[in-house]
């Protein structure tokens, strides 16, 4: 037992027999990859984004089924396609989540897009706007410096006319250029 060193050797103090065991003398200088005192990263929040083709949400039963299914997955924002809900509006659901929807008033038997935003981050939504019954976007204020723009689209099938596909691409480009955000 007497062969163990009880004192930590100090560089440049060969004459002095005293060892300094206080925290400041044992602190790592930070030059190595395996530094013991690393700077802590600021806390981050993960945004879980999901998409779902619901085929219809005309009745309240369909909406309740969707809310029940969302309880089983991790999500913060869910983009919905083919909702078939009339009009462009913002609705607060029974669960406290918010539904942002868009479809034409006259032809709501097909198409329609929407976002469901979790009640935890609903206060971060600064703007939502629909370009057509196939394209909608949402702007989130991530922090005091950055904003995030989410564009959700319902693409036509491969058998659709080229005009419909070109119109979709034009709508997406228009939505992208409409907002001045750091991230899209």
What are these regions (language model features)?
Residues 1-184:
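A shared catalytic/ligand-binding motif for oxyanion handling
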